[in-house]
Amino acid sequence: MAASTSTLTAAGIDLIAIGQLDANGGDKATQTAGALENGLPGNLLGGVGSGLTHAHGNTFLATPDRGPNATAYNSAIDDTTSYIPRFHTFKLKLKPNSAEAALPYSLTTKLKKTTLLWDRSPLTYASNGAPSLNDKRTFYFSGRSDNFDPSLPSTHPLNGRFDPENICVSNDGKHVFIADEYGPYVYQFDR
């Protein structure tokens, strides 16, 4: 039997532009603007590197991490907060730079929309962990690492905690798939 071999391939990577976001005004989910446990606003715009995907044209979707947890307040739960996970819709526009510029393009970014992540079925949370925005038909996820029912297995499909780590748009463009670092999950959400 012949031994199989695999060939490693590499692709060159070129930095072509650097963009910036103005995080001072927060994201578009103004209903979450109240202070989190660590004192930061619940609609802080940042950390959008957990997932980025091209949707179409110059539209991109990005997932922030489970919320702002760089401000220490409770190391027992990794300083995670009750931040409601979300994804953002951005317009990114490249414009050619002059030949003398350090990078070939400049990048303009504009936040168009913020979509909070929720389920129609009641999610399970730790005691007193349900987000205050929940209503009879909308159950929001939470970025807090201890916001789950410990009596249920970690594979429980309605676990209320969620740490988004990737995003992909469906072929029809109507849905997104988002992976969860807290469990072996990939969720489908409407756009």
Where do the PLM segments sit?
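Sequence/structural signature of beta-propeller domains
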Residues: 2-191
